[in-house]
């Protein structure tokens, strides 16, 4: 899908939770291009004992210039920050044959790219890289290129968050 769309976070029970560790419904949806398998599908050859679902998305954060309006003189704000998220979940079990089903998976999101400004100045003081290889560096978390900040050359490029989710199917 393409665009801004409200989505329920993976494995979230709306009766028990306000959100997950990686994503929640408490913020405006991020405009994105997203490829997904939203519901579990059976893996061929497993006699319906193994199912998978997941997604891969890239987008951009928007704030209707809120940061520019809110930032006090001399303070920093960032524009044109990019977004990446991905998930992969497996469900093992077959309710018709055995009463217990388990699901497990990984969910990750990252912020990267963008330009940092000082309130009152037109030119950015820092531009984070966002070429094709930077999209790959976020997809498969790896260190940044030579034009990334030093900390992101040593560690991973972008601000990554993620969670492993394991539990019985409710």
Give residue ranges: language-model regions.
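Transmembrane beta-barrel strands of outer-membrane/channel proteins
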Residues: 2-6, 52-60, 102-110
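Extracellular loop and loop/strand-boundary signature of outer-membrane beta-barrel proteins
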Residues: 18-23, 72-76, 154-157
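Long, internal scaffold/assembly segments composed of regular secondary structure
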Residues: 102-104, 112-170
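Outer-membrane beta-barrel translocator domains and adjoining extracellular loop/strand segments
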Residues: 12-19, 64-73, 115-120
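Short loop/turn motifs that connect adjacent beta-strands in outer-membrane beta-barrel proteins
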Residues: 40-54, 91-103
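Transmembrane beta-barrel outer-membrane domains
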Residues: 24-30, 47, 79-85, 159-166
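Residues on the lipid-exposed face of transmembrane beta-strands in outer-membrane beta-barrel proteins
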Residues: 1-2, 33-39, 88-94, 168-170
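Aromatic-lined, polymer-binding surfaces characteristic
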Residues: 4-14, 18-32
């Amino acid at each position: 899908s393409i665009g801004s769309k409200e989505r329920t976070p993976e494995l979230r029970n709306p009766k028990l939770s306000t959100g997950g560790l990686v994503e929640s419904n408490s913020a405006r949806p991020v405009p994105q291009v997203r490829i997904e398998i939203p519901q579990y599908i059976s893996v061929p050859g497993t006699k319906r004992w193994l199912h998978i679902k997941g997604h891969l998305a890239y987008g951009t954060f928007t704030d209707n210039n809120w940061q520019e309006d809110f930032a006090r003189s001399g303070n920093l704000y960032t524009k044109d920050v990019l977004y990446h998220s991905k998930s992969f979940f497996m469900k093992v079990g077959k309710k018709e044959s055995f009463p217990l089903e388990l699901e497990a998976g990984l969910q990750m999101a990252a912020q990267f790219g963008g330009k940092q400004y000082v309130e009152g100045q037109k030119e950015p003081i820092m531009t984070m890289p966002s070429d094709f290889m930077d999209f790959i560096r976020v997809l498969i978390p790896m260190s940044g290129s030579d034009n990334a900040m030093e900390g992101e050359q040593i560690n991973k490029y972008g601000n990554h968050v993620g969670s492993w989710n394991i539990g019985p199917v409710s």
